[in-house]
Amino acid sequence: MAQNAVSELINFAELMRMSLDYACRHYERTPSGMIHPNVLAINVAKFHWASNYHAMVRHLHDVSGGLVITVPLEADLRNEESGKYLRKYLKSVPGAEPETRMRIYNLIRDLTADAYGGWQFVVALQAGGGLNAQRIMMHRTYPMADAKAKALAAAGVKG
């Protein structure tokens, strides 16, 4: 169902935005004074991105349909003969012009279904060392002792 796919896309976008916002607001400082985003938050965000990017592209393609790869050229729309048919068959809701729809389909294709899209499919997963690299960094940077102490305190156990 399209509404579910759109909800998944919203969820993904907002979790990414919130993760990156958190990483910047909770920046870290090196001994020399240089500031950088929170390492744990960045690795959690990267893990979320890499784990879910492919499913988000699938949702986008599901909502968009086959026109992502079959939409005619804008030159065909401007052609006197073919343009009248394209305007007729690419018509949807009032206010959604065929040229606008075509440009959106072209953008989706460019970002997800052509050479760049294929490259991005690999990079989304492998940039930064892949999922295992993010797992390692999360384990290295998560304040496990603090979490354990809080859990014990919540359970009424003296640590």
Label each residue range with its predicted role.
Residues D21, E28, S32, I42-A45, ...:
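Polyanion-binding and phosphate-handling cores
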Residues L40-G159:
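Alpha-helix capping/hinge segments and adjacent helical runs
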